[in-house]
A protein has these predicted regions:
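Short, charged surface segments at domain edges that flank catalytic/cofactor-binding sites
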Residues: 2-50, 74-79
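C-terminal, charged low-complexity interaction regions
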Residues: 132-195
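Residues that form generic nucleotide/phosphate-binding pockets
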Residues: 15-19, 37, 41, 87, ...
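Pocket-edge structural micro-motifs
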Residues: 88, 122, 131
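Polybasic, low-complexity binding patches
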Residues: 74-82, 93-128
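Histidine-centered nuclease catalytic patch
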Residues: 53-86, 90-92, 96, 101
Length: 195
């Protein structure tokens, strides 16, 4: 899970909201072009074509707009640009796993850096809390569970990535899929190559 550095709200979205007084997100279905434009903008300008939750590469067709704070629980934030990111469409993890679940302990990737809370298990590919007790542990645990970040296929993909790259860590590119896993591997190179 990576930090999303939001840009200022794009002018096209500001103008759309001025022109159309929508009262909920479902009304955006009549304006699919703006939803697509928002996804394109976020993917290219803020997320480097990756889901911020699972870090898998996505594109406009394999993604959906995600409300960090669920629109059903926070109806006044349904078009707050800082509450919108683009997530993968996986049916078992990320935004679809989260649905309308909410906890004040959920790590908001726009407001907080998930790397302060999360780490990796190099043997299993699973995401783990960085701390073993306290508030940071609780935030990590809640977020991992809500997003199902240890979905079997996802953990296996991370494990295979670690195994496939453990002897070429010096050549990993920082962008693209699994960017925080790559940073973790670089920072823990000695322990990874000894496994």
């Amino acid at each position: 899970m990576f930090k999303v550095n939001k840009t200022p709200e794009p002018k096209f979205f500001q103008e759309f909201k001025k022109k159309h007084s929508l009262s909920n997100w479902n009304q955006y279905d009549s304006y699919r072009y703006i939803k697509q434009q928002l996804r394109e903008y976020s993917l290219f300008e803020e997320q480097e074509l990756c889901c911020p939750y699972c870090e898998i590469e996505i594109d406009v067709d394999t993604s959906e707009t995600e409300h960090i704070k669920p629109k059903d629980i926070f109806p006044n934030e349904f078009q707050d640009f800082n509450n919108l990111i683009v997530a993968c469409k996986s049916s078992k993890r990320c935004g679809n796993s989260k649905g309308s679940q909410w906890s004040p302990d959920f790590i908001n990737p726009v407001l907080e850096n998930p790397q302060n809370f999360l780490t990796y298990d190099i043997k299993t590919g699973e995401v783990r809390p960085k701390n073993s007790i306290g508030t940071d542990y609780e935030k990590a645990k809640v977020t991992i569970d809500i997003l199902n970040l240890n979905d079997k296929r996802l953990a296996e993909a991370r494990k295979n990535f670690i195994l496939g790259n453990k002897y070429s860590i010096d050549y990993l590119e920082p962008e693209g899929e699994f960017r925080t896993l790559k940073e973790f591997m670089i920072d823990n190179k000695d322990s990874i190559t000894s496994v």
